[in-house]
Amino acid sequence: MNGLEAAVQAAEDAAVSVRTYVPGYPITDLAQALRCQISVNEKVALEIALGASATGLRSMVVVKQVGMNLLADPLVISATHGIGSGVVVLVGDDLGPRRSQVEMDSRFYAPLSELPLLDPSRPGLLHASLLEAYTLSEKLRIPVMVRVTSQLLAAQEENIPSRPLPSTGQRLEKESWSLTAKGRHQRHHDRIMALAQEASESSSLNQFQISGDVGIIASGHPASLAQELGVSVLALAYSYPLPERLLRRFIDGHRLILVAEEPEPFIESILSQNPRIKGKLTGHLPRGALESSDIIQALEKLEGRPDKMPQAYESVAERGYEGVCPDCPFQVLFSSLAKVDAPVAGDAGCSIQATRQPFCSADVAYGLGSSAAVASGFSGKGIALMGDYALAHSGLAGLINAVWQKRDLLAVVLKNEVAAMT
């Protein structure tokens, strides 16, 4: 069973009734295997899930890392306003990134929203983490996040038994409305996060492997890599909140510690005041995704300062460029825009192809659906280029704003009736 299949089994075991998603690598295949309902954008996807939760239905939201930016508003608010039945946000980080406009570490949304995040390392732990996430979500009445990567979804593991988690039918309680926003936040700190901290400390999903005086603290896929090296490893179930007592015991029992995580030094930055802690911040490990060879080399040089090697920035020519689809009907449009004497705003959908060879006709491309708002900020006339999915996702708001402000722009919508850049 691979990680994708383990997640599907967990959703069935947990009797998850409402499943929403927004397509995007690396979670599109996962969401379709989960039979999720596509949503117009990530904010709406989470809001549907919150509504289902309030009325007693377990729900799951599946998004890629950049989707966390859009659903942050209801996510942060739901932490203190409470929920009914369990809500899990299953987020896929595109490490590399292969099909994203930016590399992001979604774990940073956990302390921002003050919500727990589990970061499993292999398919069996992904299955168990999802069940634990629903149990914790209903106990604390808050959403819980679980992070996956393409490596985890593709990893294989045998004998992952089904473990049904019957639905509780728990509905939203209205007691939150008796408190002010300040009072809800106080309660969240005093009661909810204290229970989340204890869940992180006592989770049976934390894994120990003791061997020698050098230890590795790891989460996610790097934990599975570290466990193959025959050294001491503490594989964390939760990236947030971190199990402080567990970490202290492990660190105190070892002379040096390497923190292996990806893509950013999220855990290391919390532990970095201890000079025995090494990792990405100290230059022992590279930023971004990790391979076994990275961890092995770091262990070999853990005693001293790592060699500072000049870094070559990855180029499109080096990595390779997929290009537009051979039968893309918009190639003539992209070529024609290069001849127009006006700035062109694309976005993260198919219109991003206009920024590249052989067209080079779009000047800027930010988030999905951003082109109308960006073009309305140009100093003079401008052109906004977006797909029909980008228009529905968030582009319509930019168009309404441009009309209201009487901005001089031409909006071109690429109608292909599909979210193709996923």
Model-derived segments and their meaning:
Residues 1-123, 151, 273-422:
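Thiamine diphosphate
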Residues 62-63, 88-92, 145-149, 217-219, ...:
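Short beta-strand segments
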